[in-house]
Curated annotation (Swiss-Prot):
Keywords tagged on the record: Cell membrane, Membrane, Transmembrane, Transmembrane helix
Species the sequence originates in: Staphylococcus aureus (strain NCTC 8325 / PS 47)
NCBIfam families, sorted: PRK02237.1
Residues that span the membrane, as ranges: 5-25, 31-51, 60-80, 86-106
CC per GO annotation: plasma membrane
Protein name, as recorded: UPF0060 membrane protein SAOUHSC_02615
Keyword Transmembrane helix applies: yes
Location within or outside the cell: Cell membrane
């Protein structure tokens, strides 16, 4: 179970990091090089996601969505200095429970 978690985290870092660099370029006036690097990192995210050991694309991406939510809230706390409120936390917990329900049962 550690390998899929590692891939989810690595994919999340690429998706959030790449998206943030594009945000900086388009919304905050950073150079186009920053946007280009962000785009390259987002492409890398798409490749990394294919390394998951689960056979179903839809299930992998649905489960990754829960991980992405948690990582986005952590990013907001660390980078944007925006603390999640109780509804953010409750929603994130519900998402993680959903991810576990989707990934933990063995399927024949």
């Amino acid at each position: 179970m550690l390998y899929p978690i590692f891939i989810f985290i690595l994919a999340g870092l690429c998706e959030i990091g790449g998206g943030y660099l594009i945000w900086l370029w388009l919304r905050e006036g950073q150079s186009s090089l920053v946007g280009l690097i962000g785009g390259a990192i987002l492409m890398l995210y798409g490749v990394i996601a294919t390394f998951q050991s689960f056979p179903s694309f839809g299930r992998v991406y649905a489960a990754y969505g829960g991980v992405f939510i948690i990582m986005s809230l952590i990013f907001a706390m660390v980078v944007d200095k925006q603390m999640p409120d109780k509804y953010d936390v409750i929603g994130a917990i519900i998402c993680i429970v959903g991810v576990l329900v989707m990934l933990l049962p063995s399927r024949a």
